[in-house]
Amino acid sequence: LMFLFSIFVIWVHSYNVDLFSGGAQDGIWSLADRIENFVSVGLGQIAVPGFFLLSSYLFFRNFSWDKIVGKWKSRVFSVLIPYVVWNLIYYLGYMAASRFLAIRSVVGRDIIPFSVQEIWRAVSQYAYAPIFWYLYQLIFLIIVSPMIYALVKNRAIGLFWIVGLVFAVHLHLDMRHPNTDALLYYSVAAYFAVHRRGLVERSMEEEAAGWKANHGTREKKAAPEDKDGNTASVIPAHVRRRCFAEGLAGVMISVFCYRRMMAPEAAVLWTCFYRMAVPMTCWAFACGVRLPKIRPWMRQSMFLYAIHFIVVRFVNKGTAVVTRSLAGTTTAAGISLVVYFLLPAIAVIVSYILAKFLVRFLPGVWRVLSGGRKLEG
């Protein structure tokens, strides 16, 4: 799911109708705008809430007070250091690019000064890499994780806390460090990790139990893999049916929330509900199907998240410059949509090539930029 959400994030930043339309807004351009907006908003905007849900669940899964220091230490290397380094890279890159007239229009910035104040602004306000607002929020959520655990550890208090956050979001009682909606996503996943882990993971547990029963063993071992790396065990029929039913219910809830979210003057709470419902629905369906083995190019989540914006910006703006004579035409609309839907694949390919290069020739740099993540399982 991390890789799927990474693709959604790329589409959020891939919107390009304004670059190719030449100011045209009717006919084919209106259709192109609706298509890209639906994908970028309807699907793309669930990515970061999905990241919050997964990050929180993994943090609080098997959590206890004696593990807090270890959890914090691991997040320093996997979240904090990459956040600081990537923001500095973006700042230095923009600063250098802004001094070359030929590419200044591509980066879209005037000459950027080099100063301690600007470096601090780049890191503390993610001024040159707005995509890192997610990691910025995640850092604060990790800091307050002991408070969240203390609240959700008790079932009743945890539910009261989540209901309180729902009302806070509805009443626009906003915080910045962290945002109220981010705190809601993180707390919901924490509650499930502490109290409802069996519900979340029962499909995998039943599949493993079924395989062990069929093979006459009680050993705790993984089901075998076939020649392609797929799990060779067969998911029990009743598990598939239940996951499909849960996924179908999730689809109906998601559609209902989406329609309410898109209504004029809709309450922001519907947006939060929609952005929670879709990742949970994806998880329900994923538990009922036999997923292929995770490939190395799917494991570059942090690196892909960090670098995709550069790739998207240069491909979109570069293509728009090359085809500027077609701006506003039907051909340009077709080009914009083709580029839009190809950008995730382009970003993944470019990111993976760079990742393989770093892993082979600069492994220390790769560890820092990826937060210690590995391409190979």
Identify the function of each model-found stretch.
Residues 35-48, 123-137, 169-188, 256-281, ...:
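Interfacial loop-to-helix transition and helix-capping segments at the boundaries
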Residues 362-377:
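Membrane-proximal cytoplasmic C-terminal regulatory module of class A 7TM GPCRs
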Residues 12, 86, 90, 145, ...:
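Alpha-helical transmembrane segments of multipass membrane proteins
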